[in-house]
Amino acid sequence: MEGLTLSDAEQKYYSDLFSYCDIESTKKVVVNGRVLELFRAAQLPNDVVLQIMELCGATRLGYFGRSQFYIALKLVAVAQSGFPLRVESINTVKDLPLPRFVASKNEQESRLAASYSSDSENQGSYSGVIPPPPGRGQVKKGPGSHDAVQPRPSAEQQEPVSPVVSPQQSPPTSPHTWRKHSRHPSGGNSERPLTGPGPFWSPFGDAQAGSSAGDAVWSGQSPPPPQDNWVSFADTPPTSALLTMHPASVQDQTTVRTVASAATANEIRRQSSSYEDPWKITDEQRQYYVNQFKTIQPDLNGFIPGSAAKEFFTKSKLPILELSHIWELSDFDKDGALTLDEFCAAFHLVVARKNGYDLPEKLPESLMPKLIDLEDSADVGEQPGEVGYSGSPAEAPPSKSPSMPSLNQTWPELNQSSEQWETFSERSSSSQTLTQFDSNIAPADPDTAIVHPVPIRMTPSKIHMQEMELKRTSSDHTNPTSPLLVKPSDLSEENKINSSVKFPSGNTVDGYSSSDSFPSDPEQIGSSVTRQRSHSGTSPDNTAPPPPPPRPQPSHSRSSSLDMNRTFAVTTGQQQAGVVAHPPAVPPRPQPSQAPGPSVHRPVDADGLITHTSTSPQQIPEQPNFADFSQFEVFAASNVSEEQDSEAEKHPEVLPAEKASDPSSSLRAAQADSKAEEKTATNVPANVSKGTTPLAPPPKPVRRRLKSEDELRPDVDEHTQKTGVLAAVLTSQPSIPRSVGKDKKAIQASIRRNKETNTVLARLNSELQQQLKDVLEERISLEVQLEQLRPFSHL
């Protein structure tokens, strides 16, 4: 042990004393535990004790190991023998007597009584008694409680120096553990020895004459005035009773700093103290808590938000984890704020923890809101609370003024801005906000509906969807084809049509057909649902309809007129505009064209087609959609080759797809019907007028028939009707072989162009839909991030 030589007697004596001081059997004795009592019992001045602690190395380490403890005892013996206090003296001084520790007569009697009561440290009612030096054969390792804390004379203890805010009549039975904070090597209030009955050791500073008689009071026992007042004994029972009421001694109070020692102290308090419920709040404590509550929240019926509570309780300097646990216990309703009752419970727990009490796993019943018993002032009261006000501040600075107007002043202004605390202080409310942010957004406009197809699978804000809906309605007032309104069957039907028409990715991007992007103007068409979604309806507004089929001014928001303009020459648009000017009155023609056309985008069209055969009025308004091919023939003859070449270059892959679909028997039948119908149509207008020639239908009708390939199966009856009508028309109309060949070529060319145009538009629509989808997803993610960044904004 660093060259320390001990005799057998010293070895045994020091070993017994070390075991006596090492309550937790950790081989590390805290500096201000029983060791402090031992040194005080040696009746050495404060400066000598501090010097001994420095020399042995305990001050540097913060605890006494066995070697430091033995050296300290050796130095105590050196000091008591009057030799110079140096480390060298422990080996140079010969025949050094064992260190002497003075115990009063009362203490010895108490020790004797304790031996009869219990050998357990936890039950030592006379824990304030420290056994005499083991060398004299009186050493008891852990007899009763080892603490030297003795009750003070009631006269002294009734000093009127109570804290400004702290009640003066704190529970008389609160153990001295509440005043553990004052026991520092500094010696506390050594200048105020309380002479009274009971075995007290002389203070560090001066060995008093009465100390030999047992009247010397351990100065540390009377720490800062706040503790004296806080634990005022104005109405306490006699000193004899006090002996049994103060089980926790210096040892408990100091070792309480560790978790294990805290558990021991609590056990001692539970078993040896006379108070009933340590968690009950007395009237005095309640009043103090209420006053503190008012400093934060003047309205007693109000509540203190988590942020304010955090700022207040952080001043207690308790670890963040403990404060978090206290918050979880006290925030009974988990609303992120503290009511008055919850605040009192939290304050009580903080005070208790500051005084060495373990925090309970669950909130004690006496602290639960609406169950707090505040009328037990006559009861022995709850220790945690009393000393918490004055004692807790004294822990760090023992010299703090006794007056404690508020915890804000007494507790060091140390706001531990820890995220851990922040999470605990506002966890309950923030967690709800984060998990339910969607519901917070939704109420923005409950009347609006999510209209855009993409958001159907997502959850965009309704405000954004409302804007989109307004745009849609501006273009399609009567359009019942919004994604939300389309029936699943319609969607599947449209998907079929799209696949048959070879719209690769355009129509099914969002899980619904691209019919949305091909709406002809339902406003003008009225109830003609069949032509509502004509295949080439992508032409947005009447400004620039697709060349072959001039659109009637649908003003569709999703159409891409600019692209169409680029694709087709301006002359085409001009001709079509002219064609639109005079709608050809060809009732029979719309019937065949409508049959396939509606099928392209609406399953309802199948039914509508059948009825449309008889409802020519509906078809009439649609006529403007059909180009007047009597005029178009000339243009087709000249520009067919050019447009075909250009379209083939732009979309070479479309043509094979279209051709691939032609071989199907159903498509061929449809085309044959359309061609025959077109021929007859051309003949019919010849009789009437060249402008009304039904040549215009070919492009769209043919496309419709192609699209309706899937629907042709369910519309077999309709098909037969159309064939019958065509046959009748053919028989009634004289054939014009001269124009038939020309018409065929023109019609086929226009069909190809329309197909290509439709494919281009479908692909463009698909791309635009995908872009919109991506933008919406990005918007949603940004909204989510925004919500996550402001969960605590309400506090």
Swiss-Prot record:
EF-hand domain segment(s): 318-353
UniProt keyword list: Calcium, Coated pit, Coiled coil, Membrane, Metal-binding, Phosphoprotein, Repeat
Location(s) in or outside the cell: Membrane, Clathrin-coated pit
Descriptive protein name: RalBP1-associated Eps domain-containing protein 1
Sites bearing Phosphotyrosine, chain numbering: Y288
Stretches that traverse the bilayer: none
Biased composition regions of type Pro residues, renumbered to the chain: 543-553, 584-595
Boundaries of every EH domain copy: 10-113, 285-374
Bias-annotated ranges (Basic and acidic residues): 707-720
The keyword Repeat is annotated on this UniProt entry: yes
Described function: May coordinate the cellular actions of activated EGF receptors and Ral-GTPases.
Phosphoserine PTM positions: S145, S162, S166, S170, S272, S273, S307, S475, S482, S489, S539, S561, S708, S739
Upper classification of the organism: Eukaryota, Metazoa, Chordata, Craniata, Vertebrata
